Amino acid sequence: MMARKRTVGSVFKFDFGLGPAENSYVKIGAESSYDVSLGYGFTDVNQVYAIDREEAGRLRRDFCIPLNTAFIVDVPDGNYHVTLMVGDTLTATETTVKSGEGRLLLHRLQTAAGQFIKRSFAVHVSGGQLILAFSGIAPRVNALEIAASSQIVTVFLAGDSTVTDQEAEGYPYAGWGQMLPHCLNASAAVANHAKSGRSSKSFIDEGRLEAILQLIRPNDYLFIQFGHNDQKPDLERRTEPATTYKHFLKLYIDGARERGALPVLVTAVHRRIFDENGLIINTHGEYLQAVKELGEAEEVPVIDLADKTRKLYEAYGAERSKRLFLWSVPGEFPNHPSGSVDNTHFQERGAIEVAKLAAEGIRQAQLNPLMLFLN
C-alpha cells in the first residue's frame, strides 16, 4: 500500500517485516529508509533487519529488528495515540522505546517466545515529526498504529536541567521530566519545555513561559520546578525566596489559570550532598519553604519532590546513591570518556526513580483526572 503525506486527522498503520502487508497497513521493511516524499521511514537502515517466521497472522508472522535506530513519521504538531505491537513466535524479546528527545515510553518491555503484546501510549509532537527510537537486547516491532487525538491531556513542564530532555549526546544524562511519560498511560502526554540553566526569572525573560501559554489548553497541567538556578548570583537568573522568586512563580500560576489549565508547584530536587551522619544537606535554603507558602496562599497543589528525593538518597546511602547521578569512571560511558563527578544531574536510572516519585506525588495530591492516567 502506497503511503501519502499526512494531514491532521490521518490514521497511520504500519506493518513491519518481510511478509505481505495486512489490509489497510503500509508495509515497512529493512530497506525502508526515511523518505521526505513519503513522510516516514527509519533513520538508519543499516541498523534494521527484517524477518518472516511464516506463521499464521500477517502482523505476527514477521517483524523488524531496529537496533538503536528510530522510525520517523511526518505529522502536524499535537498529541498522538500510539499503539505498538511486539513479539516473536520463536524467541523471547526485549524492547525499549523513546520518543522525541529521549522521552521514555516503554522500558525493557519483554515477551516470551510465542507471546505478542500491544502497548499504547501518548506522544506529544513538536517540530513536525513523531520519532520513535528503538533499543534493547532483542528489540522487535511488528506493527504500529498512530492517530491524532484531541482528547489527550498534556502535562507541560517548566523547569531546569534536572527536569529537561537531555540530549542523546550526553547519555546517560537524563531529566526526570524526560522519564515521566513512562509513568503515564495513553490518556496523557508530556510536553517538556524545561531548559538547562534556567531560573524562574530567566525562563520567562527568554519567552519560554509564553511559548507554553500559547499551546496550553483547558484541563491541561503546568508543572513548575525551579530553584537550582534562582540561587545563582548573576542578575539574569537570581531571585530572592521571599519576594521575586514567589513573584515569578505566580506568573506561571496566573498564566495557566487564565487559560483554564491546572498549575502544580514542585519543590526543587535535592543535590547529592551528605553530612557526616549520612543525611542530605539542604542547599536550597528558603526556596523550598517559599514554594510551599506560595502553594498554600494560591491554593495550588505542591509536590514536595525535595523531600521525596532526600528520602530516596538517604535510603540509598552516600556511596550507593552515586548510581542515581552521573558519577562514572573514565571509559565507562562513551559520551564521558574522562569520567564524571556530578551531584546535581541524574543519569537515566536516577531520573526514572525521580519520575516515579513525581507520579507518587500526583497520586498523593489527588490531581484528578491526572492521577487516573498513571500506570
Residues covered by each model-derived region:
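Compositionally biased, intrinsically disordered or flexible polar/acidic segments
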Residues: 1-168, 174-177, 336, 345
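Conserved beta-strand scaffold positions in the cores of enzyme catalytic domains, especially
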Residues: 13, 190-192, 299-302
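Short, structured coil segments at secondary-structure junctions
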Residues: 99-101, 184-186, 259, 298
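Residue-level detector of flexible, active-site-proximal loop/helix-junction positions
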Residues: 111, 162, 197, 270, ...
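Conserved SGNH/GDSL esterase-like catalytic core that processes O-acyl groups on lipids
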Residues: 151-157, 162-255
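Alpha-helical cap/lid subdomain in secreted, periplasmic
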Residues: 207-352, 356-375
